[in-house]
Amino acid sequence: SGGEPTARKDLEELVNHASKIGLYTNLITSGVLINENRLKKLYDAGLDHVQVSIQDTDPNNSEKIAGFKGHQKKIETCGLIRKVGLPLTVNAVMHRQNLHNLKNMIELAVELDAERLEVAQVQYYGWALKNQTAFLPTREQLDKATIIVEEARI
């Protein structure tokens, strides 16, 4: 809802300043506009952490939910984040259209060497509020998801 921060040309400068004054810096990104060189520059500027949003483990459904093709780029970016030495969180907004892939999402986060998987729910405002029936999980989906999460807890 706040826009893609990697579109900013001065992002490294902002990260550097924030780091110098003692702030924790966390880049929340779609992961599609960034490359290894930029990640290295952000790391050198003092970036502490990166969070990448992945809509689903199924590329077609992921791109349908996101509204653009970029699933493979997101996966590649996660690998680059780890390669440059930054901690990674995978952010997965789970809902009726992708909750059936929750176990796969957990497995993907492990495969990507993510420190964390943030399982979030849809923020019901604006378009999502008007179309909430397309997102609200069924009781059966929630019950299954609860079991999956409990089994995966470390």
Short names for language-model regions:
Residues 24, 40, 44-45, 49, ...:
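Radical SAM enzyme [4Fe-4S]-AdoMet core and its adjacent flexible, acidic
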Residues 1-59:
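Conserved SAM/AdoMet-binding glycine-rich loop
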